[in-house]
């Protein structure tokens, strides 16, 4: 067993991504998951997929944390210091930016409530496939929008690498990909709502 070269990524660089190669590696039958030839483990794949019901709320919570950090940073910069970056006025006095703050806060709160519900259902032994997928999809969308808007609100300073905003914006994108892409989570939710799934809505 060996690892190939570590990939250079857009974001989440503190976590390495690489391919693990199992060369001439024999796996004991008892360790095989999801093999259709082995009745004992034929449900293994479904079991692995079911873990997403637990991990998607965790990923959603992480995404919300990044979005919250970006919003708080911009608020502190503009409100406490009154940085004049657009139109010759302190940006916190501009109505357009007030609307931005309202929208960012509302979207983060909505994503957080979805995530709380998905986690609460998991903790109480309830099936949360629908809620976990909604929370993850919503949080991934929101963190991307919030971090991008945060960069815009600080103008050239926000785009510079001397602030953490550009890092948070890069880190945010992974939330559209891992633990199921946005399209996968949207498909899960849509099929449950439209009745394609054999399970009833929660």
Predicted regions and their residues:
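Glycine-rich cofactor-pocket loops
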Residues: 33-34, 38-58, 71-106, 116-134, ...
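Glycine-rich phosphate/cofactor-binding loops in nucleotide/flavin-utilizing enzymes
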Residues: 154-202
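Alpha-helical transition-metal enzyme core signature, strongest for iron centers
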Residues: 64-71, 101-111, 115, 139-147
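FAD-binding core of flavoproteins
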Residues: 1-72, 184-186, 192-202
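A structural signal for short secondary-structure junctions
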Residues: 13-14, 144, 168-170
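A structural signal for short, well-ordered beta-strand segments
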Residues: 22, 118-119, 139
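A general lysine-centric signal
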Residues: 136-138, 173
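Short segments within alpha-helical structural elements
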Residues: 148-153
